[in-house]
Amino acid sequence: MNPSKSVTPPLWLLAELTYRCPLQCPYCSNPLDFSQQKKELTTEQWIEVFRQARAMGSVQLGFSGGEPLTRKDLPELIRAARDLGFYTNLITSGIGLTAKKLDAFADAGLDHIQISFQASDETLNAALAGSKKAFQQKLEMAKAVKAHGYPMVLNFVLHRHNIDQIDKIIDLCIELDADDVELATCQFYGWAQLNREGLLPTREQIANAEAVVADYRQRMGASGNLTNPAVRDAGLLRRAAETLHGRMGIDLPQRHADCTALPCHSARQLPVAFPSVLERTLDDIWYNSFGFNRYRGFDWMPEPCRSCDEKAKDFGGCRCQAFMLTGDADNTDPVCSKSPHHGKILEARREANCSDIKIQQLQFRNRSNSELIF
C-alpha cells in the first residue's frame, strides 16, 4: 500500500446516477445484478459527493448510468456541478432527450454531450438496442445537440456484429458533424463478458477496422475535416494494458448508483470491500481505503510483472480482467503475452474465430435477465 502523499488527487469523477435505462445493450458495463440494486443517491447526497470531489482537485464530472436522463433532478445536478467549477459532460443514449431538455441543460451550465449509437443503420441499431425507435431518436438528438452549440462526441461500441460497417459509422459521424468519434472496442466486463463468445471480433475484423480508420484519418486530414475518429484499444485481442492503468486508482474514481465508490466500472466483482460515500468521505476513500490502495504501486505485483521493464506503463494490467479470467485478481493480466495465463486469451480468440452466435442469441441487458441470473 502506498503512503497517501505519493497518490495524486483524482482529476475526473464519473457519476453513475442510476442503473435505469430504456435500452438493452448486450455489452453493457453495468453489473449483471443491477436489478438487485434498489438505492440511488438523493439530489442532496450527490451534490455533497460533487463538493467533496471538487475540494480534492477533481475538475471534470461525467454524468452516466444506466441512462442519466431518467433522473428528473439532472438539471439541478448539472447546475450544482457547474457552480462548483466542474467541466461537465453528459454521457447518454439520447433516449429521453428533447430540445426542451437541451435548453434546460444549457441554462444549468452543461459543457459537453456524448451520444452513443449501436450501429450506423436503423435495423442493426434496433437489434442491438432492443428498440425500433432508438435510431431515429438518436439522429434527431445528435442534430439538436449541434444546433444548440454543444461540443459533441459520438460513441460506437464495436464488436463482431457492427465492426465491419466501420466505414459507414465514420460516414454517419461526418454527416452529423461530430467533433470527436469514439470507436470503442467492446470491453469485456459485465454483460459483455457474459456474451463474450458472441461479441468478440476476430483478429481479421480488428485489422480491417484499423486500416479503414487509418485511411479515413489520412483523407480527412488532407481535406481539413476536423472530426477526429479515435479507436479505443481492442481489449482481449492485444496486449495494451497500458490503456487500463487509469482504471485502478490512478486518476479515475467512479461513483456507482448504489452509493459505492469504485476505482472502475467492474471493480465491484473483486474480492475487495469498497466503501460507501454515505459512510466515508471521498478524501478518506481515495487516500486511505484498502480497496483503492490494494493495487497501487508495484509492491503487490507477482512475477513477471515485478521485474518487467513496462510495469510503469501498464501497472500490471487490469485486475478485474485477471480476476474474471483466472479467479485471482493478483495474477498477471492474461492479456499480457508474458502472463502464465495468456493461454486463456488465445483460447478466447479461437472461440471467437469459430463462433456463429447470432444477435438474437445474446443475453440482453434487461431486468428480466438480471433477475434470472441472480
From Swiss-Prot:
Pathway: Cofactor biosynthesis; pyrroloquinoline quinone biosynthesis
UniProt keyword Oxidoreductase, yes or no: yes
BP terms from Gene Ontology: pyrroloquinoline quinone biosynthetic process
Reactions it catalyzes: [PQQ precursor protein] + S-adenosyl-L-methionine = E-Y cross-linked-[PQQ precursor protein] + 5'-deoxyadenosine + L-methionine + H(+)
Entry note: cofactor: Binds 1 [4Fe-4S] cluster. The cluster is coordinated with 3 cysteines and an exchangeable S-adenosyl-L-methionine.
Cofactor: [4Fe-4S] cluster
Enzyme kind, highest EC tier: oxidoreductase
Family membership noted in the UniProt record: Belongs to the radical SAM superfamily. PqqE family.
Subunit structure, as described in the record: Interacts with PqqD. The interaction is necessary for activity of PqqE.
Annotated function: Catalyzes the cross-linking of a glutamate residue and a tyrosine residue in the PqqA protein as part of the biosynthesis of pyrroloquinoline quinone (PQQ).
Full protein name: PqqA peptide cyclase
Phylogenetic placement of the source organism: Bacteria, Pseudomonadati, Pseudomonadota, Gammaproteobacteria, Enterobacterales
This protein's encoding gene: pqqE
